[in-house]
Swiss-Prot record:
HAMAP family, sorted: Ribosomal_uL10
UniProt-listed GO biological process terms: translation
Gene Ontology CC terms, in alphabetical order: large ribosomal subunit
Protein's name according to its UniProt entry: Large ribosomal subunit protein uL10
Family according to the record: Belongs to the universal ribosomal protein uL10 family.
GO MF term list: large ribosomal subunit rRNA binding; structural constituent of ribosome
The organism of origin for this protein: Leifsonia xyli subsp. xyli (strain CTCB07)
Organism domain of life: Bacteria
Gene responsible for this protein: rplJ
Function: Forms part of the ribosomal stalk, playing a central role in the interaction of the ribosome with GTP-bound translation factors.
Length: 172
């Protein structure tokens, strides 16, 4: 009994420390395949095979009731502590290569996710790419603003220069 309580407490800690949680079914995968999957997401997540009943208890204690119906059969959870998009992409790619892995649902930013929504999360670009695009947009805007502010000044210089040339040619 104490072992089960410790497991529930550990699961609660994982739920607390995760930015997202992705629920999968791994029926039929070999130990080697599970090890490969764990390795592929280890930078951003902890992938744990879980007991359904204990996971339901821990999830419900954390206010996550969306897993109740999904926690059937052999279940494993990716507790994401990094980029949820990267983990969703890794799970999707692994599931394409190994159709026995099924992404069932998820929980992200206080909201339950369906399997389809986890797929949409995987379709997003990574945080780093989005930040780079945002920085590029800011940089382009700054260059545009600098050009806009410099345009009247350079136009005035060109006008004065043209007048000077006109006066010089008229004087000759």
């Amino acid at each position: 009994m104490a072992n089960k309580e410790a497991t529930v407490a550990e699961l609660e800690n994982l739920f607390d420390s995760s930015t997202a949680v992705l629920l999968t079914e791994y029926r039929g995968l070999t130990v080697a395949q599970l090890k490969t999957l764990r390795t592929s997401i280890s930078e951003h997540a902890t992938y744990a095979v879980v007991k359904n009943t204990l996971t339901k208890i821990a999830a419900n204690k954390k206010g996550i009731s969306s897993f109740d119906e999904e926690l059937v059969g052999p279940s494993a959870i990716a507790f994401v502590h990094g980029d949820p998009v990267a983990v969703a992409k890794s799970l999707r790619d692994f599931a394409k290569a190994n159709p026995l892995l099924v992404v069932k649902s998820g929980y992200f930013d206080g909201n339950p996710l369906t399997a389809e929504e986890v797929g949409k999360l995987a379709d997003l670009e990574s945080r780093e790419v989005l930040l780079a695009k945002l920085a590029g947009a800011f940089k382009a805007s700054l260059f545009g603003a600098a050009y806009l502010f410099n345009a009247p000044l350079s136009q005035a210089v060109r006008t004065v220069d043209a007048l000077r040339e006109k006066q010089e040619s008229a004087a000759e």
